[in-house]
Amino acid sequence: MFGTVNNYLSGVLHAAQDLDGESLATYLSLRDVHVQNHNLYIAQPEKLVDRFLKPPLDEVVSAHLKVLYHLAQEPPGYMEAYTQQSAACGAVVRLLQQLKDENWCLPLMYRVCLDLRYLAQACEKHCQGFTPGHVLEKAADCIMACFRVCAADGRASEEDTKRLGMMNLVNQLFKIYFRINKLHLCKPLIRAIDNCIFKDSFPLPEQITYKYFVGRRAMFDSNYQAAVQYLSYAFSNCPDRFASNKRLILIYLVPVKMLLGYLPSKSLLQRYDLLLFLDLAMAMKAGNVNRFDEIVRDQELVLIRSGIYLLVEKLKFLVYRNLFKKVFVIRKSHQLDMGDFLSALHFVGLTDVSLDETHCIVANLIYDGKIKGYISHAHNKLVVSKQNPFPSVSL
């Protein structure tokens, strides 16, 4: 593609003159076919580029050609390529500032920031000598510089405002912050989107990604109702053809809804190959604590990698609650012997649980609002409320 570097630079120039942000983004993309053109692998392209382009676009293109050069080395110079991509991002910031009342270059910004994140991830994987997450955090700083320019654009009309680029960048930053486990940095970004008058004008794919990450953050903050709201939006609006994305959303939505008392349907879990949750739901419904523990133990790595291990562990309280409710139904009394709960635990396979541990489990269930009542230690009994002693768990 483009044959010579002159043809390539001529194409970049025409895209800029036509205010064609999409084409310009393609010329600067590391995923476009032009990256395979050996004629573009130039270590010092500045003089050549300056003949075609004016600042700061010339800096963006020069840095891009240097990225291609470093990636073509054997082995690839990921760190050098990242450094040049970071320089390209800085030049894009200056370009955004130069184009005061225009937003046609937003696709270019998206592409440069996306490739910066990809290169940062490559550095984290292939390079040594720095703290894990360091390069990604530096990349986030560069992307944040673009975000600030977009967020500060209050002079343009709705059609030309750079604020329409905010959500794309926020999603890029979310992906970094979740990867390096710095979720607290998401809060000001969420506030910025909430306060943006164009928050309903962002493209639907961006809104789906945004709701997915905000839902996950709400989940980690134990704000489960909000998590269900955001994740449900993401799942409902994600097209069916993106089955892998819908499955990813369900990995978080299903356990959160289970924690709120909603059990998933077998057909849904079969469709998205998530039968792990069906096994958990069946054990939970039956109050089979031992079986629940077995499933969690067998799937521990999967749950940890998905970031839902602790959330699934919280479901265990509902398993206890369901088991002890069965004792209440059988005994048909509001004064229940603690020994009956111990026997129930032994019956489902927890043979090493003591009476003292049973007291602790029941006390935690009372504290958590899953049982309405109190423990009479003098009589070794649980006295439950005559009205709704085992409150339903729901929204």
Curated annotation (Swiss-Prot):
<keyword id="KW-0472">Membrane</keyword>
<feature type="domain" description="PCI">
    <location>
        <begin position="208"/>
        <end position="389"/>
    </location>
</feature>
<dbReference type="GO" id="GO:0031965">
    <property type="term" value="C:nuclear membrane"/>
</dbReference>
<dbReference type="GO" id="GO:0003690">
    <property type="term" value="F:double-stranded DNA binding"/>
</dbReference>
<dbReference type="GO" id="GO:0005856">
    <property type="term" value="C:cytoskeleton"/>
</dbReference>
<keyword id="KW-0813">Transport</keyword>
<dbReference type="InterPro" id="IPR036388">
    <property type="entry name" value="WH-like_DNA-bd_sf"/>
</dbReference>
<dbReference type="GO" id="GO:0019904">
    <property type="term" value="F:protein domain specific binding"/>
</dbReference>
<dbReference type="InterPro" id="IPR045114">
    <property type="entry name" value="Csn12-like"/>
</dbReference>
<keyword id="KW-0832">Ubl conjugation</keyword>
<dbReference type="GO" id="GO:0005634">
    <property type="term" value="C:nucleus"/>
</dbReference>
<keyword id="KW-0810">Translation regulation</keyword>
<dbReference type="InterPro" id="IPR000717">
    <property type="entry name" value="PCI_dom"/>
</dbReference>
<dbReference type="GO" id="GO:0015031">
    <property type="term" value="P:protein transport"/>
</dbReference>
<dbReference type="GO" id="GO:0006406">
    <property type="term" value="P:mRNA export from nucleus"/>
</dbReference>
<comment type="subunit">
    <text>Component of the nuclear pore complex (NPC)-associated TREX-2/AMEX complex (anchoring and mRNA export complex), composed of e(y)2, xmas and PCID2. Interaction between the TREX-2/AMEX complex and the ORC complex is required for ORC localization to mRNPs, and consequently mRNA export. Within the TREX-2/AMEX-ORC complex, interacts with Orc3 and Orc4. Interacts with sbr/NXF1. Interacts with Moe. Interacts with nudC; required to maintain stability in the cytoplasm.</text>
</comment>
<keyword id="KW-0653">Protein transport</keyword>
<keyword id="KW-0206">Cytoskeleton</keyword>
<dbReference type="GO" id="GO:0016973">
    <property type="term" value="P:poly(A)+ mRNA export from nucleus"/>
</dbReference>
<keyword id="KW-0963">Cytoplasm</keyword>
<protein>
    <recommendedName>
        <fullName>PCI domain-containing protein 2 homolog</fullName>
    </recommendedName>
</protein>
<comment type="similarity">
    <text>Belongs to the CSN12 family.</text>
</comment>
<dbReference type="GO" id="GO:0003723">
    <property type="term" value="F:RNA binding"/>
</dbReference>
<keyword id="KW-0509">mRNA transport</keyword>
<dbReference type="Pfam" id="PF01399">
    <property type="entry name" value="PCI"/>
</dbReference>
<dbReference type="GO" id="GO:0006417">
    <property type="term" value="P:regulation of translation"/>
</dbReference>
<dbReference type="GO" id="GO:0005737">
    <property type="term" value="C:cytoplasm"/>
</dbReference>
<dbReference type="GO" id="GO:0070390">
    <property type="term" value="C:transcription export complex 2"/>
</dbReference>
<dbReference type="GO" id="GO:0000973">
    <property type="term" value="P:post-transcriptional tethering of RNA polymerase II gene DNA at nuclear periphery"/>
</dbReference>
<dbReference type="GO" id="GO:0006368">
    <property type="term" value="P:transcription elongation by RNA polymerase II"/>
</dbReference>
<keyword id="KW-0539">Nucleus</keyword>
<comment type="function">
    <text>Required for the export of nuclear mRNAs and involved in mRNA trafficking in the cytoplasm. Component of the nuclear pore complex (NPC)-associated TREX-2/AMEX complex (anchoring and mRNA export complex) which functions in docking export-competent ribonucleoprotein particles (mRNPs) to the nuclear entrance of the nuclear pore complex (nuclear basket), thereby enabling the export of mRNAs to the cytoplasm through the nuclear pores.</text>
</comment>
<dbReference type="InterPro" id="IPR021184">
    <property type="entry name" value="TNF_CS"/>
</dbReference>
